[in-house]
Amino acid sequence: GNWQETIPDIAQEIKIVNLTSEDKNRGLLDPYVIMKRTKDAESLAIDILTFLTGISSRDGEKFPVLRRAIRSVTQSKKRGLLRVIDKLRKDGSPVAENIADHIESMTDYDFAHLLFSDGDVEQSISLNRQLNIIQVADLVLPDKDTKFEEYTTMELLSVAMLIVISTFALDFIHSDRSIFKMVDLDEAWTFLQVAQGKALSNKLIRAGRSMNAAVYFVTQNSGDVDDEKMKNNIGLKFAFRSTDIKEIKNTLEFFGVDKEDEGNQKRLRDLENGQCLFQDLYGRVGVIQIHPVFSDLFHAFDTRPPVQTEEMR
């Protein structure tokens, strides 16, 4: 969106980081570039490379080799995911060569350059404004029904980038506790489907509670949040209109109300534009109407097609 143009009064407090596959953005999502603390960078590097390669920590043959290469990079002066490939090559064992080939095969994709650096990237993403928006262009997100084992390389890379950004958000949450912070994660269903994403989401919620921050997960279906611990830790719930009876029942169950009650089903099915089913911190459930008091904000975040927008005006 053109938020700086559509909300000129606070334009100076809006920072938009648009991550495209251009060379200037090379390595900006590399764990060793985006994370401030070396320990956090190493941990994220492990998560990303095990996610991309499918190597489990329970794999007694491959995981120790990969872990050793990552640790060696962490202890080096120049740090970046491309350096992990170099360390694996130096290892020389067939297992290390195989892992190196696997990782290297993913670096050929244009926007994969965002994830992989050789340790020479000097700039980094900073969140020094009141409203910081990180966008990644050309993401290829998997279909909701696609099994993890069937993800294409582009889909794996796309989800990996969202995991990096979400981890960066966790780092942001842990900043100054005296300042209230908000993190909004769009298309959250993509990483809620994978083990690393679920673990990260629970960390975000717990950190939000202790570090004076609100974390919003924007997802397509209530069923995307299937972790019971996570469900119990979500304080506020918003659900918009649905006509699919299965999704309606799942949503009502998520809100803790009778999913078989036809009145409840009708209430969710008949919601109008600007209305949603809402559950507050005390567990009370009801329909609320959202009134955008400031028209500037309404138009700034209006994502409808231009023709439809003009008709509504």
Predicted segments with their positions:
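Conserved H-loop
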Residues: 186-187, 210-213, 217-224
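Short, glycine/polar-rich helix-capping loops at beta-to-alpha or helix-loop-helix junctions
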Residues: 2-6, 224-229
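Residues in the short beta-alpha loop(s) of Rossmann-like NAD(P)-binding domains
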Residues: 134, 221, 243
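P-loop NTPase motor domains
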Residues: 1-13, 17-206, 213, 268-281
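P-loop NTPase motor core of the ASCE superfamily
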Residues: 33-79, 225-313
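Short hydrophobic alpha-helical runs that function as membrane-insertion/retention elements
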Residues: 15-18, 214-219, 237-241
